[in-house]
């Protein structure tokens, strides 16, 4: 994959490599976000040892490991001799790294933990007894394993990391760089269908339009992303069936635990356990109104899919796989996806507006946001609320994807709703509409 716009992450890696003390850097994030590409670019400039951990037996993994060391360190003897076990191999690696000042990178470290039980304990002992400078990067896509076996309080390596880097999807602004000659609408559609995953965007950008890309890549039994969500979920979970049903319910618009349980068929008594697991995997988000004083204990929490591609897949592909496998992806596109476009894109546009306010808030509303969220109660919902708690200023924002928007009508309704929120009594209030319509209203922000 092409290295693209991970400047801050690369800077952090380079800075940690210049530290005088030993460094253990943990890098994690879901599949296809460019972690390996980032680390390979870092490795190039540092002449680092890079080991891509295989899914295999301990003995086979050791053979791969020894071969990799022989090539990286230009030691022909390593190709002939065999280490008795992982303890000896890792001891040699540590000694060579310290002598030559070579950073060590273990990509997909969870696979090594699964293939070689106790390898994390070996690394821990070697780390603890060494007081010389060494740089180790442990990277993984299996978020549950990274959190439990590397970062968890019962993990052998707990408390030893110097840095934690969570690699996140690109924002709309950054992922749009993959589509430099496209219209705003097409960029938004691509973001809505493929999210901020650079590997998806790189492939999608090779097609002429967003609709062509989803038809070829997703709504096609042989498409490169047709089975992608199954890999994501099955790789980490033992009972994927219930989780698939929950993800489908979320993609269909169910947001509250009781709604999700009823729609998915998962017992109400167990739904929170499933939701917590999906949240730890960073597949879903738990959101509360911006005004909540104790978010963790809030009873107003909503759950939403954290990934646009998963939202598309579980909304359109999961319930219609039989249609796709009959070769009727084009019909699915014309009869279900396109007619549903404005409904599907509403939350996507809201997400884009949120990111735009976070990035360019001062330019758009005149001051720097300190906090951005949503508001809802039993009576009203407001798409975006922007706070400056220091100056007690607040901006209420409605986001409208449609091209024809009666801005004055939306603003009047927004002002009435904002007056009902008592949390901002005495604050300076502003109301805005963000849309793709063009108007001279000073409280309208054009995005398009």
Region spans (language model):
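Phosphate-binding site recognition
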Residues: 1-330, 334-335
